[in-house]
Amino acid sequence: MLSFLGKSVALLAALQATLSSASPLATEERSIEKRANGYANSVYFTNWGIYDRNFQPADLVASDVTHVIYSFMNLQADGTVVSGDTYADFEKHYADDSWNDVGTNAYGCAKQLFKVKKANRGLKVLLSIGGWTWSTNFPSAASTDANRKNFAKTAITFMKDWGFDGIDVDWEYPADATQASNMVLLLKEVRSQLDAYAAQYAPGYHFLLTIAAPAGKDNYSKLRLADLGQVLDYINLMAYDYAGSFSPLTGHDANLFANPSNPNATPFNTDSAVKDYIKGGVPANKIVLGMPIYGRSFQNTAGIGQTYNGVGGGGGGSTGSWEAGIWDYKALPKAGATIQYDSVAKGYYSYNAGTKELISFDTPDMINTKVAYLKSLGLGGSMFWEASADKKGADSLIGTSHRALGGLDTTQNLLSYPNSKYDNIRNGLN
């Protein structure tokens, strides 16, 4: 999900509400509308975060979060969804896990997230498939009816075995009209199989279906937005990665608006993407506004919208938290830097005049501004990439969003999975 804006990811909540229509889809749409009773405050949790970052499911501040999107599952060309890290996903034994359990049991993040769900009944967990690295096989997986059915079946198998509440598809990105059409068919198949599973094993429960969607026009202009708005519960708009090592000049990472007086600093902006999604047929209340919990750095620069030389990793004592040019929010601002605000673009950045390093990132004030913006347009809530990078306490971006949003969605998660392959999930960890 952390994508360069050639990728510009945007997850948007989308269920086209044509309430005047008497079609079965409109009826289903109305019932889904009633299920969410407040704003979404969603966060991506990465399975690789349990290693060097040492961020475990128990570290989530669950009271601030409505949806945890567990990333990522891989997929094969025939649509088969597979674990990309079996140890992290369901094998790792945590301190309170016994090595003497009888039967077949899930461990790893699957069990830990189920424990979080049990303790926080308003928190839903979704299984995310793809991402920037693992999107290669989506065109093939979506290209035939057989592959689409296989994708849906294998995705739902993991979902019910691990005790999750829905599926998130992160295809980066459909490249043409054919792929965009096949994406819709793929999502319709997943929706159909989710509903069939619910009818048999969880009557009355609605499993969620979401996507990550791009904020870059070159990518979202290819999508069938109105169709996505009908089949999905949420479209999470990845409204970040607007500038970085791929950019010719320094710029804002996640600005709300363009700045006509400094266009080099705002090659992209969130407002244009949001308005285009709505014009394209996505109901505003299904759009979830993505926000970054990281900053992008530029070195040897005089300021925003100007030339730079490097982003880190090439000397000068600056690299990044985990990769060159990308800093966890909890490491910012760096010592010696002062925070600047572009009041036109609505974007913050830090600048150190001595080292000539600029880092664009969201602050708590920026989150408050973005939440006010999304509320003004009737959007569905906030989404964050990703959980391990946040600060604790009053400066948490996720927590700031919760406080600014006010009433979060409290619809209950599901704890009953009678046909999970794992004894402990099937028994509700009892």
Curated annotation (Swiss-Prot):
Q: Which InterPro entries match?
A: Chitinase_II/V-like_cat, Chitinase_insertion_sf, Glyco_hydro18_cat, Glyco_hydro_18_chit_AS, Glycoside_hydrolase_SF, Glycosyl_Hydrlase_18
State its Enzyme Commission number(s): 3.2.1.14
Q: Which superkingdom heads the taxonomic lineage of this protein's source?
A: Eukaryota
Recorded GO molecular functions are:
chitin binding; endochitinase activity
Residues of the signal sequence? 1-22
Chain positions recorded as chitin binding sites: G103, T104, G130, G131, W132, T133, Y173, M238, A239, Y240, D241, W385
Please name the catalytic residues of this protein: E172 (proton donor)
This protein's record includes keyword Hydrolase: yes
Question: Which biotechnological applications are listed for this entry?
Answer: The antagonistic activity of Trichoderma harzianum is used for the control of several soil borne plant pathogenic fungi.
Q: Which CDD domains match?
A: GH18_chitinase
Q: Does the keyword Signal apply?
A: yes
Query: Domain GH18, which positions?
Result: 39-408
Which keywords label this protein?
A: Carbohydrate metabolism, Chitin degradation, Chitin-binding, Cleavage on pair of basic residues, Glycoprotein, Glycosidase, Hydrolase, Polysaccharide degradation, Secreted, Signal, Zymogen
In the record, the note on similarity to other proteins reads:
Belongs to the glycosyl hydrolase 18 family. Chitinase class V subfamily.
Q: What is this protein called?
A: Endochitinase 46
Annotated source species: Trichoderma harzianum
